Every structure is written in C-alpha cells, then in structure tokens.
Amino acid sequence: MTKVLALAEQVVRLPGAYYHYLQREGSAMNNKNCARNVEILYAFDDILGWFGEHGLREAYRDELTFLAISHLLIAASLRVARIASKSELLGQFSDYMEKNFPDFRENRYLPRLDRNKRLVYRLLLKRRYRVVRLLFRIKDGR
C-alpha cells in the first residue's frame, strides 16, 4: 500500500470502510514467537530500497520515518517486549532506527501520536522494556 500511495496522482477519502484486514493466527502480528518479528526489518529494507530506486526516499523522508516509528519502533517493539523484554530484537529495532532514520526523534509527525503511544515511545527510547511489559500486563489484567 505504501508504494501505491507514493505513485498515486490523486488520493481521495471515502465515507466508509471498504477494506477488511484479516490477521491470521500464524502471522507475525499474532505470533508468540519473538523471532517472527524480525520480518518487519526485511519489510522496511524492501520499502526503503523501493523508494530509493524510484528517487522518492528524500521526498517522503518524514513520512517513511513516521511509518518506521509507528510500525517498527512502537508496534513491533511492543509485540516483542510483551513476550520477552530481554530479547535481542529490541536492540535491533533501535539500531535499525538509528542507522536508517538518525533524526527520527525530530520527526514532524510525532505530535500525532496519542498519549499512550507517546508514553510507550518515550519508554522505548530509554530502553525501559520491562516497564513497558509491566504496563501491558496491568492493562491486560494479568
């Protein structure tokens, strides 16, 4: 979808929801196997490569950075931290962000994060993975 939007001449918003997303039981999103979450790094390598090949990486730098913040740094880190707060993957996600998006902390879209995601984002930056895990255990009632 990201690649399609980058090449679209026009984007319109429709009043209803016309896309039904299905999360399969074995998908990386629902899997209790931490190692499956490494796949998001491959996906971002693909996205960044495609945008680079098409000369669009710099034009969409802020948007790609925020996409990585949302999906890689926050969502994937949350999935892993909830399973194993000492997983090496958490460091790999942080390293990937530093290497590919060195100025991600100044991204202009960060204010769009809601309060909860902003809290998680700050905890992840400080590598407080056990605190994140504990917060979600409390939230989930476990």
Feature annotation, model-predicted:
Residues 1, 40-46, 126-135:
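Short charge-dense sequence patches
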Residues 81-142:
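Membrane-interface aromatic/basic loop that binds lipid-linked glycans or pyrophosphate carriers
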Residues 65-78:
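Amphipathic alpha-helical repeat scaffolds of TPR domains
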Residues 60-66, 90-91:
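Short, charged, amphipathic alpha-helical segments
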Residues 38-39, 47-48, 76-79, 123:
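Short, charged/polar low-complexity linear motifs in solvent-exposed/disordered segments
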Residues 42-63, 102-107:
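C-terminal, non-catalytic tails of nucleotide-sugar-dependent glycosyltransferases
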Residues 3-5:
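Hydrophobic residues within well-ordered alpha-helices
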Residues 9-43, 57, 82-84, 88:
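Nucleotide-sugar-dependent glycosyltransferase catalytic core
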